[in-house]
Each structure stands twice: as C-alpha cells, then as structure tokens.
Amino acid sequence: MLDRDGFRPNVGIILLNQRSQVFWGKRIRTHSWQFPQGGIDRGENPEQAMFRELHEEVGLHPQHVQVLARTRDWLRYEVPDRFIRRDARGHYKGQKQIWFLLQLVGHDWDLNLRATNHPEFDAWRWNDYWVPLDVVVEFKRGVYEMALTELSRFVPRCEFRFDARPEQRNRYLRGGLHQRDLLANQSGEPGSFPAAGGIPSYATRPGAPFELPPGATFEPDPQTSFGVNAPTKKT
C-alpha cells in the first residue's frame, strides 16, 4: 500500500525503560541496529499498527507499555535503489512514518524476540537516549534524528541526561564522536559526553539488576569503533 508519491505508511517505536534508556534491536543476521518499526496494514490506524508491530518484533502487549507521545506528522526517508526489488523500482520510493514514544511499565523479561515465527531481531540492548547513529543503516539516520529530537521533550527527566546545546546534540546524533573525545571523557574532562552514549554495562555496574530473557547470552558490543565493550542481550 503506497501513497501517490511512492511512500509506504509505516510506524516507528522508541521504547524506553524506567531509566529512560532506549531499546535497540539488532537486525537478524546483520550488524545493523535499529528501533522497532513496520508497515501499516490496510484498515489499520497508526496506533493499531504500532501495537501489532510491538508484539511481533519485541513480544510486548499494550499492558506492558505506556504511550507517552507521537510525532505530529509523517517523517519520510527514501530507500536507495539497491535495496529495492527490481519489480518495485519506479513505484516504491521509501517509507513515511509516524513515530511513537513508549515507556515499558513491565520488566525486561517481558521482552521476547521470538513472539512470531518470523523474528526481526536476534539481539537487543538498552542505550542512553542520545547516542551516535553509526550502527543504523545510513538512509534511516535522518529520520531517527528527527524523531528523537521531536519526542525528546516527552521523555521522563528523572534519569534523562540531556545536552541542550543544539550543535553538540546534532554532532553527537550524527556519530561525530571521535576517539579523542572518548579518551577525554574517560579521563573525566568537563563537558565531554558519556562514552558511546553511556551504554550501561551489566557486568560492571554494582548491584545492577541482571534480567535476561530465556535463552539469552552475551556477545561483544557491536560499537567496537568506539572501543567500548558492553554486553548485549541475545536471543
């Protein structure tokens, strides 16, 4: 189902935990990480599609989340021809998305990447809200930045670390954090960002809750370009 401009209606989901960290899923059999998303079926409204995709991709039901906000309008991205089937070229142009900001009111163990027989992700992790987007496929990064920026004012502030300087926030979102910035951060230099977005390490945080879904294992952090080794949750 395409609109007259060749864009498929779609929903995207930014899922927060109680610490205002964001769910990231690793696309199955790839090194690409992304937020849950999916198409709107005929007869569905965006909210119905969001709850369906939430269950299909991460195994959650409406009672597991609270809807905090949604984007005011469609956000669009174009898909390069090399990612489009030959028979769809010339017709399909990309996706237009309504983004939802949700907060998990359940537990980590409620997440289930195998809720259907066609899983989208094979690993997942919690990251801080503002992190470099280098692990996202390039043509989606602009939409991610727009969605995160528009919905950021609805994020609960109790655990939310936010740098209000637009030039710093945009640089950080676009993955402009260099190794020298990381080294400065690790040395405690004022004004530096959390390393790799402050990705939590369940292995090193004293007293941290250790909640993994059934069958979960650890693998190295995919963001090896940042020199950070935090565990990830894999199913």
Swiss-Prot record:
Keyword Chloroplast (UniProt): no
Cofactor(s), by name: a divalent metal cation
The organism's place on the tree of life at top rank: Bacteria
Nudix hydrolase domain: residues covered: 6-149
Gene Ontology terms, MF aspect: pyrophosphatase activity
Motif Nudix box location, chain numbering: 38-59
Enzyme Commission code: 3.6.1.-
Disulfide bonds: none
Database matches in Pfam families: NUDIX (PF00293)
Disordered: region residues: 184-235
Protein name, per record: RNA pyrophosphohydrolase
